[in-house]
């Protein structure tokens, strides 16, 4: 996961191919929802299968729960992705232009894609969050299911890490 503006800026070549769903769901309302609704379990199941380092890491009952939830939320899921290509980019650009940065401790945990995606997630996040802790976990996209101990440890460390700032400041 990257800041939205940075995500769209790095999508080319291999990253664009991996992120094809972003382009699909960024289209105007109607067609993306219709295409996904025609075979929602195939669409969402595809990502459950290819984004997990070990597809067995997601137990059958959890997979079913994910598919059921996604099936019922197609309009909301697509709207969220659509916003990422529009208003979210505008907001990120405005924040970047005015120097707004996250002033609280931030932990970014990413799955280990190696160098396949061609960007440095920590460097991209550091531009937004000066008090950044970055970790790479050997797993696929579904980190909570595939590496629960690592994720719980990182969350405990984040929640107990003192802030380097006396107060949270957001420029307005």
Give the residues covered by each predicted segment.
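Catalytic active-site module of serine/aspartate enzymes centered on a nucleophile-bearing elbow/loop
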Residues: 131-172
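Flexible "cap/lid" subdomain of the alpha/beta-hydrolase fold that forms the substrate-access gate
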Residues: 1-137, 156-161
């Amino acid at each position: 996961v990257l800041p939205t503006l940075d995500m769209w800026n790095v999508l080319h070549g291999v990253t664009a191919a991996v992120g094809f769903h972003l382009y699909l769901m960024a289209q105007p309302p109607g067609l993306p929802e219709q295409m996904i609704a025609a075979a929602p379990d195939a669409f969402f199941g595809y990502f459950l299968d290819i984004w997990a380092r070990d597809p067995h890491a997601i137990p059958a009952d959890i997979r079913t729960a994910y598919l059921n939830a996604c099936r019922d939320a197609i309009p909301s899921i697509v709207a969220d992705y659509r916003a990422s290509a529009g208003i979210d980019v505008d907001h990120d650009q405005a924040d970047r232009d005015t120097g707004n940065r996250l002033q609280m401790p931030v932990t970014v945990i990413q799955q280990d894609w190696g160098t396949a995606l061609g960007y440095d997630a920590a460097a991209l996040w550091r531009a937004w969050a000066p008090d950044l802790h970055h970790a790479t976990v050997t797993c696929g996209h579904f980190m909570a299911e595939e590496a629960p101990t690592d994720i719980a440890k990182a969350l405990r460390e984040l929640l107990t890490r003192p802030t380097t700032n006396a107060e949270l400041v957001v420029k307005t």
